């Protein structure tokens, strides 16, 4: 149960801080907003990797859990439970953010609670960006945490968090990076 709760808390932190930064920056597509949002997501992953990584592996994302499962590093029961607890953590974070937004009118301006300027992109571009960027992120996570590639796992959290920053820098323009 401890590893499932760690995933819930880690996903809460990632969602609350990453999406909280996006909301605080009014989900803007200006350079400062994009960089700030990307940094918030990446640094959240780095912090959680070193906080809960030893407990659960710090997947904090169902796509990562699916990749770990498909690579044979995790059984189906744990993968399913991770995804359930990750979803619960994300829902709690979204609820807390909603409460904060609705009690602070300055955050309910422009597009802070809905589609941003990225909404003008077509579905194909968005789907292509999401699939490719998710693949790249899972690829980095699996490589950085592999025991057979000679990588120093002490730095896996840093490599993963920095790659998430890069993924957001690219993906925010297309979809807002889910």
Indicate where each model-derived feature is located.
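Membrane-interface helix-loop junctions and terminal tails of multi-pass membrane proteins
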Residues: 1-178
